[in-house]
């Protein structure tokens, strides 16, 4: 049997720039058995797919000069994994920066303030140039020791023949330091020979402060980058904390509370009202309504009875439940989602890949240019001091401060701006790629709509007031546990309806209806089919109910003693900002598609109100991922949703955007999270992404243009022609200015108005979706053959792996598998024998009992 390829996660240490992650990725990719490797510098993580042993992978990383450790995957290790994601780097860098500044400020005062502006200094140093040089040497040495990590990483990478940005920082700072030490010795010699002219000349050639300034500026950039890293892992840490910590199990006929890791398959556990389900299981006693919003994104509670399945992290809103554990530990749905999100953590922004390539060429090229510059000037007869100064100027002016800061600073500011407005970009790639969206797929419930049913219309019959209708409906529905009842109760509370009607003989009748007695009158409430059994419904009210239904609303009929008293319409209403948000997206040239499981009539009504371009109705949760896959054939797709049934689609999409009011699982399966649950934040996120990407391009353009102009100038290319030569001091100043320009440009993002649609521009590569609609219809017409398979042994959603097996068969177009129903509906374009279907399922260790 061929080894099964799996995704394994590793924590990587010692990486400092894009060149580091590229080297680790290259080293691991060369290991036999590794089919895919992705290293994320932002999360210091690595995802590896293949059959290679973890010890071999770790050794490959260590041979490349870095460290690696395999991450835990068990549910009980979630807290330890979350601890691994804790931001420890930022406090260390902040401490290094503050300490460096404590020595840099007096160093700059002595070197720049006194020498250039004649600021006062202690009398003991006045005129004592050697002492001034020694103090500068001391301060610089201390700063270099504080920031020794640059030198360790830089020279270690150079030793491994893979120079990175730290290498240039180390070489530039060390070259300045070495040159200044040489000048200090030369000045000391001149003073010993009483050559004061030479002493004064040498005094102005100290560059200790530049050596220290390089390290301090890079530390600023590293700290900004570390802060950005810390924020991108917040969502993953929240997901890990969502895992239940304890459960109440029955042992020796007693209820005892145990740690979640002590719950085993087959254990009996109990859940009281208001408590979360600890593990996946089956109800063996009791019934209740479960709020499954933690898994489905739907806020309406789902009725559960004996034999129904329950999932970890869902909330028991009412009723005492006794359940048998079926999936525990890493096998629960929640744990599988945690693992899925962890697998997706090792991603890389496209612009980081560009940085990898540039770094691999830029660093060794600059070193070669510096060496070549020195040799050429020596060959043309210049002094060693002149040649050395030109070489140092090349190293220093091309110090990749601007290049290193261009992306992380812009991303840091962009992320900060987003966070300030409730828009969280989980990674650099999400911030970069969101603005390139061509198609937006919107889940209806909780995204376009509020996700909470509300009363929209009250239509009493003649002779009955709205207050009377609402009072009777309130009295009847307050005893109901039906999800739509809460909408009527909320409306009654808003209307200050008092509890002055008492219901007796209350019965929840099968068939979506309620009945009871108020005094001597029998009242009924429910759908049209139910009420028609007990009261005559006028034709005008039937037409009104159809009109309400066409608007995407659910009409509830109420009757009293065989007389209809009115209709109350309930609907999951559209959010106030949804139509405007859709319009803004369309003005950007983005096609907007709405996905919903509703029937076509309701879906079109809501789609019309929202103003979307296309409506795809009747989409089952597992079908959303398939729709997104089809849309991706037309262009770059962003999926917006709020529940776990959106998670596969969020993952399949080029960019997954989660509404914050949804589940933590959906949030962590997505790339962007809208904390305020406003659809208008979707176009805002796209604007911010575009602005940030533009800012990064501006920063990189400046960084490269600066180097293209600065390196030849520093090398003395214009010296023979125009007499221009660049003093290393001005090279350092230029380098500092380049970094300042990059940071300042990035800070401009703080002024960006992300909710201002007046400057929106349409994308040039907008797509046409009519063909996809036609193709989808054609595919539905082609599915003329269907077979329903009854399957035993499927206990949870993970058992639906048979879907992939069936869909891999030639002639099978789609397989819709339900573990709850114990069925698989197979749609075929060609005949597939029952024997083949049966064998395919039974190869997965399930039993086929019947095929219709």
What are these regions (language model features)?
Residues 93-95, 314, 438-442, 448-481, ...:
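ATP-driven catalytic headpiece of P-type ATPases
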Residues 187, 196-198, 212-273, 304, ...:
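Juxtamembrane coupling segments of multi-pass membrane pumps/enzymes
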Residues 92-246, 357, 458, 723-728, ...:
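Transmembrane helix-loop-helix hairpins at the membrane interface
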Residues 1-133, 143, 229, 254-255, ...:
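Flexible metal-binding regulatory segments at protein termini and peripheral loops
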Residues 295, 354, 389, 402-476, ...:
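Conserved catalytic phosphorylation-site environment of P-type ATPases
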Residues 31-55, 205-206, 237-331, 429-473, ...:
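Conserved cytosolic catalytic loops of P-type ATPases
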Residues 2, 22, 35, 437, ...:
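Conserved ATP-binding TGD loop and adjacent catalytic N/P-domain core of P-type ATPases
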Residues 116-130, 159, 178, 417, ...:
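Membrane-embedded alpha-helical bundles of multi-pass transporters
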């Amino acid at each position: 049997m061929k080894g099964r390829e799996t995704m394994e996660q590793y924590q990587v240490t010692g990486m400092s720039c894009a060149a580091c992650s590229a080297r680790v990725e290259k080293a691991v990719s060369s290991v036999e058995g590794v089919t895919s490797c992705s290293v994320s510098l932002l999360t210091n993580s690595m995802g590896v797919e293949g059959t290679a042993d973890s010890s071999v992978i770790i050794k490959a990383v260590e041979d490349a000069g870095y460290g690696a450790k395999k991450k835990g995957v068990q549910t009980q290790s979630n807290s330890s994994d979350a601890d691994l994601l804790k931001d420890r780097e930022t406090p260390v860098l902040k401490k290094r920066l503050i300490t460096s500044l404590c020595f840099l400020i007096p160093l700059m005062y002595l070197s720049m303030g006194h020498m250039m502006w004649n600021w006062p200094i202690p009398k003991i140093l006045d005129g004592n140039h050697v002492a001034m040089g020694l103090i500068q040497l001391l301060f610089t040495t201390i700063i270099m020791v504080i920031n020794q990590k640059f030198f360790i990483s830089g020279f270690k990478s150079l030793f491994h023949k893979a120079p990175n940005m730290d290498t240039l920082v180390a070489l530039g700072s060390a070259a300045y330091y070495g040159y200044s030490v040489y000048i200090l010795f030369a000045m000391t010699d001149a003073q010993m020979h009483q050559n004061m002219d030479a002493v004064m000349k040498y005094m102005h050639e100290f560059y200790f402060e530049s050596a220290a300034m390089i390290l301090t500026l890079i530390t600023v950039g590293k700290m900004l980058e570390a802060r950005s890293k810390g924020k991108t892992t917040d969502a993953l840490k929240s997901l890990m904390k969502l895992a239940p910590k304890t459960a109440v199990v029955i042992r020796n006929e007693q209820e005892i509370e145990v740690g979640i890791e002590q719950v085993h398959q087959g254990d009996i556990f109990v859940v009281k009202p208001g408590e979360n389900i600890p593990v996946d299981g089956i109800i063996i006693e009791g019934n209740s309504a479960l709020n499954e919003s933690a898994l489905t994104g739907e806020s309406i509670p789902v009725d559960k009875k004996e034999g129904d399945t329950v999932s970890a992290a869902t909330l028991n809103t009412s009723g005492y439940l006794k359940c048998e554990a079926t999936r525990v530990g890493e096998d629960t749905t929640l744990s599988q989602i945690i693992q899925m999100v962890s697998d997706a953590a090792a991603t890389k922004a496209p612009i980081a890949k560009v940085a990898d390539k540039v770094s691999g060429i830029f660093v060794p090229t600059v070193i070669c240019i510096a060496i070549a510059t020195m040799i050429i000037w020596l060959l043309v007869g210049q002094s060693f001091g002149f040649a050395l100064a030109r070489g140092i100027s090349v190293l220093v002016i091309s110090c990749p401060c601007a290049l290193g800061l261009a992306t992380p600073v812009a991303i840091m500011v962009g992320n900060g701006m987003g966070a300030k407005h409730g828009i969280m970009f989980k990674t650099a790639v999400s911030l970069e790629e969101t603005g390139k969206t061509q198609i937006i797929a919107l889940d209806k419930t909780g995204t376009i709509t509020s996700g909470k049913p509300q009363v929209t219309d009250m239509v009493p019959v003649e002779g009955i007031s709205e207050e009377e209708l609402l009072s009777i409906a309130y009295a009847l529905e307050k005893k109901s546990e039906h999800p739509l009842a809460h909408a009527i109760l909320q409306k009654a509370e808003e209307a200050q309806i008092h509890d002055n009607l008492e219901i007796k003989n209350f019965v929840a009748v099968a068939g979506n209806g309620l009945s009871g007695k108020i005094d001597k009158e029998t009242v009924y409430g429910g759908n049209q089919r139910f009420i028609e059994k007990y009261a005559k419904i006028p034709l005008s009210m039937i037409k009104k109910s159809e009109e309400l239904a066409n608007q995407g609303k659910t009409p509830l009929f109420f009757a009293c003693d065989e007389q209809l008293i009115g209709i109350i319409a309930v609907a999951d209403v559209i959010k106030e900002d949804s139509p405007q948000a859709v319009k803004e997206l369309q003005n950007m040239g983005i096609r907007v598609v709405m996905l919903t499981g509703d029937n076509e009539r309701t879906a079109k009504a809501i789609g019309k109100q929202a103003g979307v371009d296309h409506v795809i109705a009747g989409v089952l949760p597992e079908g959303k991922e398939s729709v997104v896959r089809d849309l991706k054939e037309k262009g770059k797709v962003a999926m917006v949703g709020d529940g776990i049934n959106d998670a596969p689609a969020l993952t399949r999409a080029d960019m997954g955007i989660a509404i914050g009011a949804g589940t933590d699982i959906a949030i962590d399966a997505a790339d962007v999270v809208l904390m305020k649950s406003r659809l208008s934040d979707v176009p805002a996120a796209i604007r911010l992404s575009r602005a940030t990407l533009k800012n990064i391009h501006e920063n990189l353009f400046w960084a490269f243009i600066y180097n293209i102009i600065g390196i030849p100038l520093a090398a003395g290319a214009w010296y023979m022609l125009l007499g221009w030569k660049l003093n290393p001091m001005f090279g350092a100043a230029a380098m500092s200015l380049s970094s300042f320009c990059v940071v300042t440009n990035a800070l401009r993002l703080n002024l960006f108005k992300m909710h201002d649609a007046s400057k929106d521009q349409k994308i040039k590569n907008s797509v046409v979706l009519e063909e996809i609609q036609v193709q989808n219809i054609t595919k539905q017409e082609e599915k003329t053959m269907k077979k329903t398979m009854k399957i035993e042994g499927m206990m949870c959603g993970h058992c639906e792996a048979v879907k992939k097996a069936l869909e891999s068969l030639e002639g099978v177009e789609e397989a819709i598998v339900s573990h709850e129903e114990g069925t698989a509906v197979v749609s075929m374009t060609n005949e597939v024998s029952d024997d083949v279907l049966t064998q395919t399922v039974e190869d997965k260790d399930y039993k086929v009992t019947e095929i219709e």
